[in-house]
């Protein structure tokens, strides 16, 4: 939705153009139909409510943490352990209010369950992991903050990315190809919830965007 420095070319602009007044207005005129959010430059699924009754029902499911969300991401290095559960408090970064951080005292509880699907080991290139993340909560920047907490970051993440990743000269071409990622390598792949009017479980799955798929294909080809 429109935010600081980004008032055009948003999902809300497209929704208003296509559906005009056929959207819920529980969040006011600036966010019609928007029940939840995903980070800017993250691809994948969002659920949109066309009326206030559905919006209220879906909002409660998000509040109860009963909606199932699964993300795929590419991260630098290897997360230890390979599979696990991250449970912390997350609050706004005091030094940079646009970022979030893990907090020992203040903040909202955030839980991410993760599973390493594959580790790519390519000569002269830092290891890269394909990771599946399932959210029990949906805090702002949650996956990215939790990965930083574990000592890593997403490929293409300009806000939380690691600054000390070293590439040898021979792999400048590889680095340039990674730079073609359209944002961080994070994709909201599946979303499942109880339909607000049909009262049955519905599940949706989104294909990987082309830039993510090309990067994954590149890693698979180089790692053998």
How would you name each of these model-derived features?
Residues 71, 84, 88, 110-112, ...:
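Short beta-strand segments
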Residues 40-41, 67, 108, 139, ...:
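Short flexible coil/turn linkers enriched for glycine and charged/polar residues
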Residues 131-134:
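Short histidine-centered loop motifs in beta-beta connectors
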Residues 139-147:
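Short beta-strand segments enriched for Tyr within beta-sheet-rich domains
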Residues 105-109, 115-118, 122-126, 146-224:
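Pseudouridine synthases involved in rRNA/tRNA modification
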Residues 15, 47, 73, 114, ...:
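Residue-level signal for inorganic ion chemistry
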Residues 97-105:
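Short aromatic-glycine motifs in intrinsically disordered, low-complexity regions
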Residues 1-85, 89-94, 211-220:
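RNA pseudouridine synthases
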